[in-house]
Amino acid sequence: MDMMLLVQGACCSNQWLAAVLLSLCCLLPSCLPAGQSVDFPWAAVDNMMVRKGDTAVLRCYLEDGASKGAWLNRSSIIFAGGDKWSVDPRVSISTLNKRDYSLQIQNVDVTDDGPYTCSVQTQHTPRTMQVHLTVQVPPKIYDISSDMTINEGTNVTLTCLATGKPEPSISWRHISPSAKPFENGQYLDIYGITRDQAGEYECSAENDVSFPDVRKVKVVVNFAPTIQEIKSGTMTPGRSGLIRCEGAGVPPPAFEWYKGEKKLFNGQQGIIIQNFSTRSILTVTNVTQEHFGNYTCVAANKLGTTNASLPLNPPSTAQYGITGSADVLFSCWYLVLTLSSFTSIFYLKNAILQ
């Protein structure tokens, strides 16, 4: 009813405008009886895709200088001739020439998505062109799992949610240390996570409208400490020597040293202890007989404790004993050979004299 009154007012002031509005009224759902629609066999339909934030130009041309046009979006009139009915400052009519009656929408948003109709009123019959504007939206990750710290063996689900038009595809990748790709999907399930599966996980949302949106999640996996190696260098009395203990664990383990049942402390009896995240080094600045014995390295964190032992013995004297025995043995054989030689000469001399 309001539209008809508007048309009647337009008739009083401008006959061509009334004609245009009447033709547009046929396109408005509010002007049609329930369950009926109007199909214009002469109407051209076009589809246009524009990225969000860009400028959309919906082309429409007048037949001659006498024809008039109007633009309609769904049930709202945007322009009628040169009169702007929309209050949106982004909307204008492009007039590159006398026949150009294109609708220009700056900084396109998702709310601009939908059908647009250009109606041109000629001297004979109205001509209608329809354009369906599709606003494409670059992918945007709006929700992703926070960085997490969990214990080894726990089930983990990583979440990555994104928006975009077309709807973006979601993919996951374990970028450190393995760079392993996973199947696509918003959720990444890891059952019984292991220490090897710790690191950074990358979520990528992509829909070919723009560059993929990429976010990362850091996963820390706690596990009980292990000692991978305990090893010593040569321990020579009067010189310095060291024992190295290599371990692993998350959180990093705390190291302790024992000699027999006695706990060792840094600076005690010429001992220096240096602890790092994955190793501990025990240095004896001046090795004496009292430093030899059984040493134990202990590594502990909140998930457990482990240890490894190494016997530290004085340098072996076997080398010197073997050398001495050889000298004595050689001397004995030399003596035997000498005595035998003299005996042989003595018997040979007697035989000649006889």
From Swiss-Prot:
Q: Does the keyword Ubl conjugation apply?
A: no
Lipid tethering residues (GPI-anchor amidated glycine): 324
Q: What is this protein called?
A: Neuronal growth regulator 1
Q: Which Gene3D superfamilies match?
A: Immunoglobulins (2.60.40.10)
Keywords annotated in UniProt = Cell adhesion, Cell membrane, Disulfide bond, Glycoprotein, GPI-anchor, Immunoglobulin domain, Lipoprotein, Membrane, Phosphoprotein, Repeat, Signal
Ig-like C2-type domain location is 38-134, 139-221, 225-313
Gene that encodes the chain: NEGR1
Q: Which residues form the propeptide?
A: 325-354
How does the record classify its membrane topology?
Answer: Lipid-anchor; GPI-anchor
All disulfide bonds of the chain are: 60-118, 160-203, 245-297
Query: Can you tell me which residues are glycosylated?
Result: 73, 155, 275, 286, 294, 307
Might you name a Gene Ontology BP term for this protein? Answer: cell adhesion
Q: Which residue positions does Phosphotyrosine occur at?
A: 187
> Could you list the residue ranges that cross the membrane?
none
User: Domain of life of the organism in this record?
Assistant: Eukaryota
Tell me the compartments it is located in: Cell membrane
According to the UniProt entry, where is the signal peptide? Answer: 1-37
Q: List the record's Gene Ontology CC terms alphabetically.
A: plasma membrane; side of membrane
- What high-level taxonomic lineage is stated for the organism? Eukaryota, Metazoa, Chordata, Craniata, Vertebrata
Q: What does this protein do?
A: May be involved in cell-adhesion. May function as a trans-neural growth-promoting factor in regenerative axon sprouting in the mammalian brain.
What family does the database annotate?
Answer: Belongs to the immunoglobulin superfamily. IgLON family.
The protein's matches in SUPFAM superfamilies, at most eight in alphabetical order, are given as:
Immunoglobulin
Per its UniProt record, what InterPro entries does this chain match? Answer: Ig-like_dom (IPR007110), Ig-like_dom_sf (IPR036179), Ig-like_fold (IPR013783), Ig_I-set (IPR013098), Ig_sub (IPR003599), Ig_sub2 (IPR003598), IgLON_domain (IPR050876)
| Transport listed as a keyword | no
